[in-house]
Amino acid sequence: MQFLTSLAAAASLVSLASARISGIALPQTVKAGDNINAIVVTEGYIQSVQDIAIAFGVAPAASAYPGTLSTLLGSFYLGPEQSNVQNNITEPITIPESLVPGEYVIAASLFSLYGASSSPTVSNYNVTVNVGNETSTTYVRSQFYVGNSNSTVCLGGYTRKI
């Protein structure tokens, strides 16, 4: 009987599962002028998160700087319908026709409210992509980690010492 009670309690927790946005994914190679799907990656989380809006930008990899968007590609309202969802969100963006072949950083900034107290947060994600002759079907995902004694920060495919 106690097993059934525990099972029922666990099942009720699963139904209350929350989610948050944990990164972005974009085609590894993009063609200038193409409309592409930017994937906003989600994951399960321990508390509720209200995602308000996300904006995307692009910069040449050589001049990209963490936490900036550079040339704006688009911004999207997320709101209640796209908050706390455990399936990825797709947003359309257009790669500027003016981009010459080479390596670029596509960045995103996300404004969210965390938990019962609605604590505001801005999260930044980025992915290094190549501008080439055609848009690939292979996607690359942002990464975030803070290094140890080297104080190395890796943000979405490019690394800078701090």
Swiss-Prot record:
Annotated glycosylation sites: 88, 126, 133, 150
One cellular-component annotation, GO: extracellular region
Nucleotide-binding is among the record's keywords: no
Compartments, as annotated in UniProt: Secreted; Host cytoplasm
Effect of residue 125 to A: Specifically reduces the interaction with N.benthamiana SERK3 and its paralogs but not Arabidopsis BAK1
Tagged with keyword GTP-binding: no
Protein name, per record: Necrosis-inducing secreted protein 1
Native source species: Colletotrichum orbiculare (strain 104-T / ATCC 96160 / CBS 514.97 / LARS 414 / MAFF 240422)
